[in-house]
Amino acid sequence: MTAKMAEPLYFRIWSSLNIICLMVTFLNVQLSKTPIVLMPLFIALLKNNRKRETKKQTISVLVQKREEKTKLVLDDANNHNHAFLYHCQYLGQKKHVVIQ
């Protein structure tokens, strides 16, 4: 009777050890495959992030160039306006002198 009782216990221990070994093997295989599967996804995310950063940098450079151009145009317009005003003042002084 004890031999019959010991056999199922031995069998249960052996089967549970087998199940544990299978689970460890499965997890080992999954863990070893995971980086291979996730690496391209991770690389794609990094590339996408770099593209976004590059786009942001390009946009900021374009905005900065546009602001510089606008500033140059405004400065040129201001200089032109000043020159025009000086010219008008000069003409006015000349006319004033001529009138006297």
UniProtKB/Swiss-Prot annotation:
One of its GO terms (cellular component) is mitochondrial membrane. The lineage of its organism: Eukaryota, Fungi, Dikarya, Ascomycota, Taphrinomycotina. It comes from the Eukaryota. This is Uncharacterized protein C513.04. The chain crosses the membrane at residues 13-32. It is a single-pass membrane protein. Keywords: Membrane, Mitochondrion, Transmembrane, Transmembrane helix. It is found in: Mitochondrion membrane.
